[in-house]
A protein has these predicted regions:
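Condensing-enzyme catalytic core mediating Claisen C-C bond formation in acyl metabolism
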Residues: 9-88, 92
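A short glycine/serine-rich beta->alpha loop
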Residues: 2-6, 77, 81, 139-143
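Claisen-condensing/thiolase-fold acyl-transfer catalytic domains that form or cleave C-C bonds
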Residues: 1, 87-95, 105-144
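Short, flexible active-site loop motifs that bind/organize anionic cofactors or intermediates
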Residues: 80, 98, 125
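Glycine- and other small-residue-rich loops at beta-strand/loop junctions that grip anionic moieties
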Residues: 6, 31, 113
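A glycine- and small-aliphatic-rich helix-loop capping segment at beta-alpha/alpha-beta transitions
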Residues: 5-10, 128-130
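Active-site histidine-anchored catalytic micro-motif
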Residues: 1-2, 17
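Glycine-rich helix-loop-beta junction characteristic of Rossmann-like nucleotide cofactor-binding loops
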Residues: 100-103
């Protein structure tokens, strides 16, 4: 069985795409990318090494022009920018990994995407011309 696993993430210091393609004999192909320019798209300011947990980091306050209330220890994501990153970068990276590994994407038995949301996974399937039946999904049952 041939599997393709894809995930992407943004950290405080870098964006990265992780793609893995595994052969039946255990051979794996990885694509790891990082540039750091969008490191603030998903963030949690407090509770870590740079800003240790304290009463101040736990205190909730209005933090943006929309009146959202959160503490420094609650996560924040710039959803539209993350979405644009995913739909621009992930298909390109998946195609590049398939080329490097010598695999036709249509030849994989299953495609395993990060279960962030169904819209993105459906978009990726269409963009890459993949059979949706070979993309397992747990989003409806478990969410992200």
């Amino acid at each position: 069985m041939s599997l393709g696993f894809w995930n992407c993430a943004t950290t405080r210091t870098s964006d990265f795409v992780v793609s893995v393609k595994t052969e039946p004999d255990g051979t794996s192909w990885f694509s790891l990318n990082s540039d750091g320019s969008r490191g603030d798209l998903i963030k949690i300011n407090g509770g870590g090494y740079r800003m240790p947990s304290s009463p101040e980091t736990l205190r909730e306050k209005v933090v943006d022009e929309y009146g959202n209330i959160r503490s420094e220890e609650q996560g924040y994501m710039q959803g539209a920018d993350v979405f644009n990153f995913v739909i621009r970068e992930i298909p390109r990276d998946i195609k590049r990994l398939a080329e490097w590994s010598g695999e036709d994407l249509q030849g994989l038995d299953y495609y395993v995407f990060h279960q962030a949301n169904n819209f993105i996974n459906t978009y990726l399937a269409k963009k890459l011309r993949l059979d949706a039946e070979r993309i397992p999904s747990t989003i409806a049952k478990f969410g992200n």
